[in-house]
């Protein structure tokens, strides 16, 4: 499972010009689910994202987590993160989870984030979405478990 995380001032996701998820300061995570992933992988990634220290403290050092700043989380599914791009001029998605498995784990990830009492917004699995964000820094990390 991969989470491409971006520290944001604000972010939103729209479907057909309708905002379906929006956050203020926090993390936008683009979530990619692979065949071998399970709930344990989702839990591990969520723990890492919510505790990853990418927000600055009073000394301007990356020392605070999403939980520390009471930040918000926007989760957007993105199967293209599971692409193999090492060969050729076209990505291969052979390692991506099936849509049903990916949807199940995506929904599980969102539910578990809400259970942590985080402020959570989410896109819609499988939808054609437009994501807008103000990347703060920019600060972007690809976390894989």
Swiss-Prot record:
Residues spanned by motif Gly-cisPro motif, important for rejection of L-amino acids: 137-138
One term of GO molecular function: Ser(Gly)-tRNA(Ala) hydrolase activity
Localization of this protein: Cytoplasm
Keywords of this entry: Cytoplasm, Hydrolase, RNA-binding, tRNA-binding
GO annotations of cellular component type: cytoplasm
Gene Ontology biological-process annotations: D-amino acid catabolic process
InterPro entries (alphabetical): Daa-tRNA_deacyls_DTD, DTD-like_sf
Matching Pfam families: Tyr_Deacylase
EC number per UniProt: 3.1.1.96
Catalytic reaction list: glycyl-tRNA(Ala) + H2O = tRNA(Ala) + glycine + H(+); a D-aminoacyl-tRNA + H2O = a tRNA + a D-alpha-amino acid + H(+)
SUPFAM superfamilies recorded: DTD-like
HAMAP family: Deacylase_Dtd
Assigned protein family: Belongs to the DTD family.
Binding partners and assembly: Homodimer.
Domains as described in the record: A Gly-cisPro motif from one monomer fits into the active site of the other monomer to allow specific chiral rejection of L-amino acids.
Role, per record: An aminoacyl-tRNA editing enzyme that deacylates mischarged D-aminoacyl-tRNAs. Also deacylates mischarged glycyl-tRNA(Ala), protecting cells against glycine mischarging by AlaRS. Acts via tRNA-based rather than protein-based catalysis; rejects L-amino acids rather than detecting D-amino acids in the active site. By recycling D-aminoacyl-tRNA to D-amino acids and free tRNA molecules, this enzyme counteracts the toxicity associated with the formation of D-aminoacyl-tRNA entities in vivo and helps enforce protein L-homochirality.
Name of the protein in its database record: D-aminoacyl-tRNA deacylase
Gene name for this UniProt entry: dtd
């Amino acid at each position: 499972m991969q989470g491409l995380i971006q520290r944001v001032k604000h972010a939103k996701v729209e479907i057909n010009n309708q905002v379906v998820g929006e956050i203020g300061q926090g993390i936008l995570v683009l979530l990619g689910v692979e065949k071998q992933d399970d709930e344990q992988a989702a839990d591990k990634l969520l723990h890492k994202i919510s505790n990853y220290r990418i927000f600055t403290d009073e000394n301007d050092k990356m020392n605070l987590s999403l939980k520390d700043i009471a930040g918000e989380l926007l989760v957007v599914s993105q199967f293209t993160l599971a692409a193999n791009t090492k060969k050729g001029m076209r990505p291969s998605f052979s390692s991506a989870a099936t849509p049903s498995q990916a949807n199940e784990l995506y929904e599980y990830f969102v539910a578990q984030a809400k259970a942590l009492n985080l402020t959570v917004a989410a896109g819609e699995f499988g939808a054609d979405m437009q994501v807008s964000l103000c990347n703060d820094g920019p600060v972007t990390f690809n976390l894989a478990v």
